[in-house]
C-alpha cells in the first residue's frame, strides 16, 4: 500500500554553518576549535566547504525549484561574537539577516540552530560546556539572537548534545579529542541541557514570537539477544548514555531514578563523578513543558551485547567497511545481526528504529508536543556521471524512513516535517569530503551544484505527499 504524509508536512533540507559556509576567517569571524583540530588531525579542513557563505542564493533557488520548503541553518556563534562574548561583530549579524531574507524570498522556512558543534575557540579552550561560565555566555548569545533576528520563526538551541559529549570525551574524534571519560560525557550533556533550559525559559519569559525546541540525535538501542537479560541491560545502559539522560532532562526536568541508577553504575565501573546542582534542576524543571518541538536526528540503530572487558572504540572515518569497534567496560559492545545492512562507514540501515524511537518519545515523554525529523539521510561515495548522481540507494533509504514516519503519524504521533541531511553536499566532521549526503551534488573545485536523481524524486514526493 502506498503511504502518504500530511498536506502541511515540511519537506526540508539540513545544513550546518561550519560544514557548509566555508569563509572561516571572513568578515571578522572568530576561530573555532575545529580550525586547528582538522589541520592537525585530519586530511581536510572547513575550506572551502560548500561556500554557502557566498552561494546561499544558489542553494535557496534550487530549494524553491525542487520543492524544499524548509531549511535547517545554524548561526556560527563566532560570527556574532568572535570570542564567544563581548563585542558583537556587525558583519556577522548582517550576513544572517541577508540569509534569512533570501530564505523568505524563496519560500523556504528557516529552522535556525544556535549551536551546531562550533563553540568559539576562546570558550572551547576554556573548558567548553564543562565550564559553567560558558553556560552564561551561551545564554547571552541566545538572547542577542532572539532580539536581533525577529524574522526567525523556529529556533533550536543545540544540535545533538549527545554526539558532542560522545565525540569530545568518549570516542575522541571531536576536539579536544579525549577518550573514554564518561564522567565528562555526562557532565557535558548535563551542562548543555541546563544551557538549553535557560535559553528556552528566557525566550518564553521575554515573549518572543515563534517556536523553540532542541535537536537530539536518538539512535535506537536494541539487545543483541532479547532473551538474554545481560544484553537487555547493555542496551539500557547504552541508551542512557546516548538518549535517555538527555531526554529526561528535556521533558522530565530531572533524571529518573532508573536513569541515575544506570549513570551511577557506569561511573562506578569507569570512574569519575558528576556535579549536579539544585539550581540546575530548578532550571530544567522550569523549561520541561516549554519546548514547542523536538527535533530527532536519526541515521542508525545499534545492537548491544554485555561486555566487561577493556574499553576500546575505533572510529571508521574513511569508509573501510568493518573497521569500526565499540565496546565500553560495564556497558556493552555493539554487535549487529548479520542480516542488517550497513554503509561503508559501518552505519546500520534500519528504518524500523526511527519508528520505534518516535513511539518511545510519545510513550515516555507525553509532553513532547510535536516532532520534526531534523536529520536523516545516507552518506555515500557518490559517482558523478552525466552531470548528476544516480543515487537509487539514497532514494530507497529516504523512502523507507518516510514510510515509517507515515506509520508513526497513523499511530497517533505528531510528526510535522522531515529534513534530509543534507540539502547540498557538505563536508563531514570526521569523514571529510568523500562522504556525501546532499540532494545537490557539489563539485568542491568549482562549487557548481548539480541536482542528483534523489532531488527529482524528493521534489515529486514534496509536491504530492505520496511516498512512491
Curated annotation (Swiss-Prot):
Q: Which biological process terms from the Gene Ontology are attached to this UniProt entry? A: lactose catabolic process via tagatose-6-phosphate
PROSITE patterns given for it?
GLYCOSYL_HYDROL_F1_1, GLYCOSYL_HYDROL_F1_2
Cellular component (GO) terms are: cytosol
Q: Name one GO molecular function term.
A: 6-phospho-beta-galactosidase activity
- Stated EC number for the protein is 3.2.1.85
Would you say which domain of life the source belongs to? Bacteria
Q: Which keywords label this protein?
A: Glycosidase, Hydrolase
- Catalyzed chemical reaction(s): a 6-phospho-beta-D-galactoside + H2O = D-galactose 6-phosphate + an alcohol
**Coiled-coil segments:** none
- Pathway note: Carbohydrate metabolism; lactose degradation; D-galactose 6-phosphate and beta-D-glucose from lactose 6-phosphate: step 1/1
Write out the similarity annotation.
Belongs to the glycosyl hydrolase 1 family.
Protein name as it appears in the record: 6-phospho-beta-galactosidase
Q: Which organism is it from?
A: Streptococcus pyogenes serotype M6 (strain ATCC BAA-946 / MGAS10394)
